[in-house]
Amino acid sequence: VDTAAFSSDLFDVLSRDLGFRTASDELRFDPKSIIDPFRTDLGYIRRAAFLTSCLKKTEVESDPYAESRALLSFLQANYTCKAWSLGVGHDPAIGFALEYARVMLRDWFEPQCGTQLVVNMASIEQAARFGPGVSLGMGRRPTQLYFKLGDSPMTAGTDFVRSWYEVSVRHNPLCEAAEMARKARHGPIDLTPVGSLSLQPKSYLTRRVCVTEPTCNTFFQLGLGEVMHRVLKQHTGIDFTVQPARNSMLAKWGSEYGIYATMDLKQCSDYIATGMVAYMFPRSVVQWVNALRTSDVNLKPYGLGDMNLGMVSTMGNGYTFALQTALLTAVLFGVYKTLDIPIERPCGA
């Protein structure tokens, strides 16, 4: 099947069925050009929204500038993160909301006036695991647990992470045996402090930036992410295992009754600066975030050298999603508190 011809014909049929004039097939990835911006009736807007979104997520066809556009956005985000500084302007409400968020994060992660540290070496190690993705040094080997644990080269970003993994596997006889077998086949854990950047299919217009990180780093990153997930679930009810279904329900209610709106934070993880995390989170969390992150990335395939990251992490890091969710949730609570808005969870959501 000719993918380009198929999507062109599909767009043409949809345009006619939805009541839009037939447009050139070259506009199928930018159908906004055929939509009347002055129409405000709900039925028209819904049809227009469907037409503008039905083909934009294709991963088969690609804009010739998609990769360069994604790389430029990543470089801009990294520059912004490096230049980050706290600036609340002259609005005391912003300062109050941020301070409330900081206090909330401290209460979550350092309860009982800081005498208890939720994020620590033991809690991270207990929750650590291997994920399904690829890691540095694996090459084209399968990413299943068997190969990561016992039959592939293994990498670590620092001596600390390497020694931590070597000690942690001794607590489980099966893991220790697997590591001994892996080491006999592939040698000791290699130090690889620089991550590898790649651009993965996302939509017609752009690509998703992912950084492949060392094996041992991702192992403990997922542990840190799980600890953060438990904290979120305990204090806010946010549960990553069911949250997508909840979000879909809320979006459906919002569409039907106009009581909710969804918001897409573009490149959110790329704009979480190291300075921002150091300011917002308690020190006991920041030290582990920094110890497990990959601070440099290799851009040589794109004509550049190694680059130091101003962002804490991006896609490919095991704690990225949990970290940004905790940060944004605390800030949201701070804004609600400042504006005196009660926080309520809809029934069934």
Q: How should these model regions be labeled?
A:
Residues 1-33, 163-349:
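Core nucleotidyl-transferase/polymerase catalytic module
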Residues 1-198:
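Non-catalytic, polymerase-adjacent accessory regions of viral genome-replication enzymes
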